[in-house]
């Protein structure tokens, strides 16, 4: 299994290097960067196992999902202005010189690196090398300077649902195709995709997944996932641009960006 996994990683890397191209801005805000790339080698799941709900009421949310299971929410907010502001061109023009803090893309994310946002976008925001470790991969997510980025965040409309006794906190991120964060857990929250696609894998609190904290989600998907019995597989779904995933308190989750992705989470702490 390990040898097969390594061969799969090598093949995926070769495919990436051969076919990755940068596409014009169009409807992807200038972030589209994966001709065939990861879309050809690691696709969306065969069947989404997380419910999608459009125009759900607060009462329905609290009764069926808030403390029980994840759900994908559609049509609750209009973030078209925020999306336009998050285009590659607009973000570089507004925040290119700002210093951003990067974290390693592993479960514990101990290492932090500070550098200009433009340098991250132009030099580090590349498709993930499938053979690299999570603790060697730098990832822009969280650690946002809300004072410097206030002109952007003030235009975001978060999901309108709240849990009693919690306070919302934003976490904004941009990551390359094939990147992601391996399994971890924390409090409840919402995660919205602005550009790109993000594949999620989720387990309930009592079901600890098999994973290595320093290996990437991509490595887990290629090496561990195929050997899982159907009963041992996680809930999974690919979140499209404009959709919001809600995850309850202490649910294990891992993410995999299928494209260069721009996203924002609202954590309920």
UniProtKB/Swiss-Prot annotation:
Residues making up the signal peptide according to the UniProt record? 1-24
Coiled coil segments of this chain: none
Any one Gene Ontology BP term:
regulation of glycolytic process
Gene3D superfamilies, alphabetized = Cupin
A Pfam family matched in the record: Cupin_8
According to its UniProt record, how is this protein modified after translation? N-glycosylated.
The recorded induction information for this protein reads:
Up-regulated upon endothelial differentiation.
Null allele outcome, as annotated, is: Homozygote knockout Jmjd8 show no obvious phenotype. However, the number of capillaries in muscle tissue is significantly reduced.
Key word Endoplasmic reticulum present? yes
Keywords assigned: Cytoplasm, Endoplasmic reticulum, Glycoprotein, Signal
List all annotated glycosylation positions: 135, 145, 214
What GO cellular component is one of the record's annotations? Answer: cytoplasm
Record InterPro entries: Cupin_8 (IPR041667), JmjC_dom (IPR003347), JMJD6_ArgDemeth/LysHydrox (IPR050910)
Q: How does it assemble?
A: Oligomer. Dimer. Interacts with PKM; regulates angiogenesis and metabolism.
- How is this protein named in the record? JmjC domain-containing protein 8
Taxonomic placement? Eukaryota, Metazoa, Chordata, Craniata, Vertebrata
The gene from which this protein is expressed is Jmjd8
């Amino acid at each position: 299994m390990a040898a097969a996994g390594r061969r799969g990683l090598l093949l995926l890397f070769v495919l990436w290097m051969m076919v990755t191209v940068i596409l014009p801005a169009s409807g992807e805000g200038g972030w589209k960067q994966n001709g065939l790339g990861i879309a050809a080698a690691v696709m969306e799941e065969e069947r989404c196992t997380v419910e999608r709900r459009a125009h759900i009421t607060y009462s329905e949310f609290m009764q069926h999902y808030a403390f029980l299971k994840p759900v994908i929410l559609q049509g609750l907010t209009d973030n078209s202005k925020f999306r336009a502001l998050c285009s590659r061109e607009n973000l570089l023009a507004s925040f290119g010189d700002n210093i951003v803090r990067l974290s390693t893309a592993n479960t514990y994310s101990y290492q932090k690196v500070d550098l200009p946002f433009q340098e991250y976008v132009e030099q580090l925001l590349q498709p993930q090398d499938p053979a690299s470790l999570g603790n060697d991969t730098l990832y822009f997510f969280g650690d946002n300077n809300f004072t410097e980025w206030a002109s952007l965040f003030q235009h975001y409309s978060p999901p309108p649902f709240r849990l009693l006794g919690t306070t919302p906190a934003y976490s904004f991120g941009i990551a390359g195709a094939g990147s992601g964060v391996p399994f971890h857990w924390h409090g409840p929250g919402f995660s919205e995709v602005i550009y790109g696609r993000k594949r999620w894998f989720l387990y309930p609190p009592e079901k600890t997944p098999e994973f290595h904290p320093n290996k990437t989600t991509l490595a887990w998907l290629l090496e561990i996932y195929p050997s899982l019995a159907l009963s041992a597989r996680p809930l999974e779904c690919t979140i499209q641009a404009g959709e919001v995933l809600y995850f309850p308190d202490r649910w294990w989750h891992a993410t995999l960006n299928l494209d260069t992705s721009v996203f924002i989470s609202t954590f309920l702490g």
